[in-house]
């Protein structure tokens, strides 16, 4: 039998292209990290294993907060979700995208990053265009969106992040720090993905700015069904917005639950050296004095006051 070298080359090329594809067509909506590991500066004196056979499922259409001390693997984990990093072991599944360990190149990387928008800490430092509208439009246009359609949406995006519409033609470098951050986040929202991933989104903001951003993320989740994944050291923010909390420690996921379950677990918080929200500090002290409110699923000071009165009446 004669060997057709041309046909073999074509088949090999096709096989290699298919190997790089991450489309699995098994959409569940969840983000799954299955036994993933990642090491920085391998085979150097600075080698650091950031993720160590970590397993994790992040539900669709929820606000999930990721907590843990510096170096616990939080930022590395979120970079796996949109292909900025690729794990050394296991696999990362994002809806109907499956990213196996060791993959050299992601064929559908633009599609993946359109679906999962990643906002780094201090995103305002990434602004570079000469007007706000150009900065907002850059990401979605770069990923293949229609330019005209993107620009049509800019007034609504400015409304969404509480910036005046007339700011569209301004230079982003004329804005305050908080306004620059709103512009950067508007650019990620403009890609219209299902998931918004945020790394310390309120770092460096004043209390009013923090509250504004938390309310924005709540609106995106409740009104548009966006999945929000937020890395933060601010436990008061976690208590306010989270549906689920993921606890990371030394490259592993060691706990997952509602904010009430996590913050009621004093032993867990002590182990990972995380300070609880102010309300829970108060409830810990009350428990020591005989008044236990830790099972009341309290988020706000008003809910605390109501529960405290009810418990005191019962006594």
Curated annotation (Swiss-Prot):
Disulfide bonds: none
Gene3D superfamilies named in the record: P-loop containing nucleotide triphosphate hydrolases
GO terms under cellular component: ATP-binding cassette (ABC) transporter complex
Keyword Iron annotated: no
Summary of the function given for this chain in its UniProt record: ATP-binding (A) component of a common energy-coupling factor (ECF) ABC-transporter complex. Unlike classic ABC transporters this ECF transporter provides the energy necessary to transport a number of different substrates.
Annotated PANTHER family: ENERGY-COUPLING FACTOR TRANSPORTER ATP-BINDING PROTEIN ECFA2 (PTHR43553:SF27), HEAVY METAL TRANSPORTER (PTHR43553)
Name of the protein this chain belongs to: Energy-coupling factor transporter ATP-binding protein EcfA2
Species this protein is from: Mesoplasma florum (strain ATCC 33453 / NBRC 100688 / NCTC 11704 / L1) (Acholeplasma florum)
